[in-house]
A protein has these predicted regions:
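Low-complexity, intrinsically disordered segments with a bias for serine/threonine
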Residues: 13, 31-32
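Hydrophobic alpha-helical segments and their boundary regions
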Residues: 16-17, 114
Length: 201
């Protein structure tokens, strides 16, 4: 099992997007009350099956929907590993308030990604969206996150609305390939709720 690691130009990261990601990087695990547990985040405003809506406590204009992987697998040298030291993968869609109806997708891997590598999100074994790890990471949030390109954002949201399951394949700094499975039940409802709750003043 191999992942394409060809070098590509780095995506341009939205400042607001990075701030929100930084707010949630300390933990990707959902608690039983659907809260990320950070001081600057509220509990989930509302949950729709596999997806939950979050709003920043300090800035209500910062908000996103998120879902944690229901299954994680790891491979090295084409052999499946029985266990790896990592947190669960999390997929985010973040509302960009400075741009009407625009969103940004990001993936929290739960481990340091290979620098500049690609992570491939495949929806229903048909559609694919490429996420990119940071080409020169320094902060922790730059090491364990991957971002979709701006030109793929609308396509990503459309695919997730129509799909039932998505699998993210990524590669770690130790050349371990991971596959995280996300269910898409409730995605459209969560996105609609996000639009209602997260509006610029």
């Amino acid at each position: 099992m191999k992942l394409n690691k060809d070098h590509v130009s780095a995506p341009k990261f939205n400042i607001l997007f990075f701030i929100i990601v930084f707010c949630v990087l300390l933990s990707s695990l959902f608690a039983t009350n659907s809260s990320f547990g950070q001081d600057n985040l509220r509990k989930a405003e509302k949950s729709f099956r596999d997806w939950s809506v979050f709003v920043s406590k300090d800035d209500p204009e910062m908000c996103f929907i998120a879902s944690q992987s229901i299954k994680g697998e790891a491979f090295r040298n084409n052999q499946k590993l029985s266990s790896v030291n990592r947190e669960k993968g999390t997929l985010y869609i973040i509302k960009i308030l400075s741009k009407d109806s625009e969103h940004e997708g990001t993936f929290y891997a739960g481990y340091p990604l290979q620098v500049g590598s690609k992570a491939i999100l495949e929806i229903d074994n048909k559609e694919k969206i490429v996420f990119f790890a940071h080409p020169s990471p320094k902060a922790k949030a730059e090491k364990d996150h991957a971002w979709a390109q701006k030109y793929d954002q609308k396509k990503l949201v459309d695919y997730l609305k129509k799909g039932s399951k998505a699998v993210m394949s990524a590669i770690s700094h130790r050349n371990t390939v991971t596959k995280d499975t996300f269910m898409l039940t409730g995605f459209s409802d969560a996105l609609s709720e996000l639009e209602k709750r997260c509006k610029a003043n």
